Curated annotation (Swiss-Prot):
Transmembrane segments: 25-45, 54-74, 91-111, 119-139, 142-162, 174-194
Membrane association type: Multi-pass membrane protein
Location(s), subcellular: Cell membrane
The UniProt record lists the keyword Phosphoprotein: no
Protein name as it appears in the record: Uncharacterized protein MG350.1
Keyword vocabulary terms for this entry: Cell membrane, Membrane, Transmembrane, Transmembrane helix
Main subcellular location: membrane
Organism: Mycoplasma genitalium (strain ATCC 33530 / DSM 19775 / NCTC 10195 / G37) (Mycoplasmoides genitalium)
């Protein structure tokens, strides 16, 4: 092992059993965690269909200790499974899936940058949290919130420019964003706070989990 540099499993036949077993285990844990999060009701956020789902931690583990391909596969499998208990919240499932994919890619990117640092995983998850908060807050303003409101019939168009204009004029919408009367300020305040808290929780679980997996599975991940 060279410092904190992670060596991925080589694509050899005798590693296939480990790949399948570990991926299946991570998928099962991700599904269970995602399901549990649906029963955790937090005032205000639950009314907006926002859940603090931290199942992505296990998808990230698969990306590092098996492969990116396997991780993307179980991410899609987890998303499809979520439709069983989220049949009326298609946009919510797609949003969580998008957040999971961005988390996987950001952790891979920042691991390449910080792999030689002493507290590697802390830096990886810290910058992933900040990047996700910025990306998803922006997407919520431009795409996700307009689609969500259009899907449930709150607005007549998913065009974010028109939605922002209607929000600013109609005080009935202000409930969604802490009573703030400006669409973009409301988007920033709500979703930056939500995403920082959510991915902060992901980091709190992700750092010790990744360090534990790194410790106990390292020998199996070394390419000899």
């Amino acid at each position: 092992m060279n410092g904190n540099k992670l060596v991925f499993l080589p694509k050899k036949s005798y590693h296939q059993l480990f790949n399948i077993t570990f991926s299946a285990m991570m998928l099962a844990l991700a599904i269970i965690t995602s399901l549990i999060s649906e029963f955790i009701s937090i005032p205000f956020f639950s009314q907006l269909k926002l859940t603090f789902d931290i199942s992505v931690v296990f998808l990230v583990a698969c990306a590092f200790f098996v492969s990116l391909g396997w991780s993307l596969t179980i991410t899609l499998a987890s998303a499809l499974t979520s439709f069983f208990w989220n049949t009326n919240n298609v946009i919510g499932v797609l949003t969580v899936t998008l957040a999971n994919l961005s988390t996987i890619l950001f952790t891979r990117l920042y691991f390449c940058l910080f792999s030689k640092r002493r507290f590697c995983w802390i830096f990886v998850f810290l910058f992933t949290t900040l990047s996700n908060a910025l990306l998803l807050t922006t997407l919520n303003g431009i795409l996700i919130t307009p689609l969500f409101w259009y899907y449930f019939g709150y607005v007549q168009t998913p065009n974010f420019l028109i939605v922002a204009e209607q929000y600013n004029k109609n005080t009935d919408f202000h409930f969604f964003f802490f009573g703030i009367n400006n669409y973009w300020l409301g988007i920033f305040c709500l979703y930056s706070f939500f995403n920082l808290v959510k991915f902060g929780l992901v980091s709190c679980f992700g750092v010790p989990i990744m360090r534990s997996f790194q410790k106990f599975y390292w020998k199996r991940a070394l390419a000899k």
